[in-house]
Amino acid sequence: GAAGVMRTPFRTHDRRRGAQIVLASAPATRLASGDRAGEALRRVDILTQTALCAEAVGAMERALELTVEYLKTRKQFGVTLATFEALTHRAADMYVLLELARSLSSYATGTLAEGTADEIVASRAKLQICRSARQIGQEAIQMHGGIGMTAEYPVGHYVSRLTAIGHTLGDADAHLSRLANSITDWDMVSIG
């Protein structure tokens, strides 16, 4: 590697590769400073959050597909699990959460495509992603039973990735706090 750069690789929670990078007197070139640097970092944060939201929508969609497929094929008491109304209602709730997440993710992506990097739009999307991902992930694992957590079955991998996304660049609480702090006209807020 480069002089003064130490890299220590590791595996992340969702089985991806990560690395700790330590810069010790490494040669550097300043790309920006002051407000310009702050704006560049803010924009990268928004772009990354929006990309993670889109990735999460895909992971939630696949977790739901696997769950519905499992309910249609797994038999218990001589019938498929899909014949139990309570389970199909839970799968329908998962679908609603997925579509809420997809809608806000698409809105955040569209806002960026129009040339606006809005941290409030990104936080709205990330908050819904965190909430939907947690519920969809928990339901997918629960409806699959023990097989859902095995390394051989893919739904657990999607849930692990959703968990990692939920904690990257702020969890649900951090984004809810950002949104609450952005309110300037409390008369417009309806509680109750």
List the model feature ranges, each with a label.
Residues 53-82, 86-98:
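Oxyanion-binding "anion nests"
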Residues 110, 133-159:
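A glycine-biased, small/acidic residue-tolerant capping/turn segment at secondary-structure junctions
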Residues 147-192:
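Glycine-rich phosphate/cofactor-binding loops in nucleotide/flavin-utilizing enzymes
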Residues 15-19, 46, 83, 121, ...:
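A generic structural signal for well-ordered coil/turn residues at beta-strand boundaries
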Residues 68, 72-79, 95-128, 141-146, ...:
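C-terminal helix-coil-helix/basic helical segment that borders enzyme active sites and/or dimer interfaces
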Residues 1-61, 65, 69, 186, ...:
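FAD-binding core of flavoproteins
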Residues 57, 61-64, 91-101, 105, ...:
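Alpha-helical transition-metal enzyme core signature, strongest for iron centers
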Residues 31-45, 71-84, 142, 157:
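Conserved catalytic-core motifs characterized by acidic clusters
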